[in-house]
Amino acid sequence: MILYEYPFNERIRTLLRLEDLFERLDFFLVQEHPLQHHVALTTLFEVVDVAGRADLKSDLLKELDRQRQTLTALRANPQIDQDALDAVISELETASGNLTATHGKAGQLIADNEWLTSIRSRAIIPGGTCEFDLPAYFAWQHHPAERRRADIIKWAQPLVPLRDATMIVLRLLRESGQSGKVIANAGSYQQMLSGRVYQLMQVRLDESALGFIPEISANKYMLWVRFTQQDGDLRPKPVDADIPFQLKLCNF
């Protein structure tokens, strides 16, 4: 299955972007080539840019606390697996405590490092990190992979609490919805939301439908999924076939 996700608000959009960046950072960090570690470092800069939103930390702390309170109230429910419930509550408390203990803006360690700041400012310029622009960075790229990796891990370490909080919030959000099979008649599907508030929509397609691309939009009254199809280098065109897919609406 191929999964498309659509956030209903800016907060979830920011968390999804952070998740994507952290996954990219993980992928390139374990590689060996200097160019791959260059991508890891520039991805770390992107994480800092996205995480620099002033109210992100407070939003995450509020959400972690709200989830903890909601789940704590379920301890009296005999139909709930109490061991699994306790494990999630403990995870929420740990994530909240670690995030609370962080000081300053996200990525402050990078902002305070003049050398990293110089790389960051040049990295936004096409071809701006050549050896004649940043000879010290060029030399760093020739260190053994283990040393480069250790450096990037050290610089990313202060962002781990933010990452952990982001991951658990998104995980619980995704687990909150129920998936159902629907059909986009003539390539189009719409559904009234009837006043219900959602934060995330998931569209899953079979691998056999890989050529169909969903274009998703929504407001507080209705959601739309329109399928298009790419034909070589041409602009995607609307599809007029009936397309089955899995739809999941998620809200805490």
Swiss-Prot record:
Annotated compartments: Cytoplasm
SUPFAM superfamilies, A to Z: YacF-like
Superkingdom of this protein's organism: Bacteria
Assigned keywords, A-Z: Cell cycle, Cell division, Cytoplasm, Septation
InterPro entries according to UniProt: ZapD, ZapD_C, ZapD_sf
Predominant location category: cytoplasm
Keyword Lyase: no
The keyword Cell division is assigned to this record: yes
GO BP: any one term: FtsZ-dependent cytokinesis
GO (cellular component) term, any one: cell division site
Family named by the database record: Belongs to the ZapD family.
Oligomeric form and interacting partners: Interacts with FtsZ.
NCBIfam families given in the database record: PRK05287.1-4
Known function: Cell division factor that enhances FtsZ-ring assembly. Directly interacts with FtsZ and promotes bundling of FtsZ protofilaments, with a reduction in FtsZ GTPase activity.
Protein name: Cell division protein ZapD
Organism of derivation: Ralstonia pickettii (strain 12J)
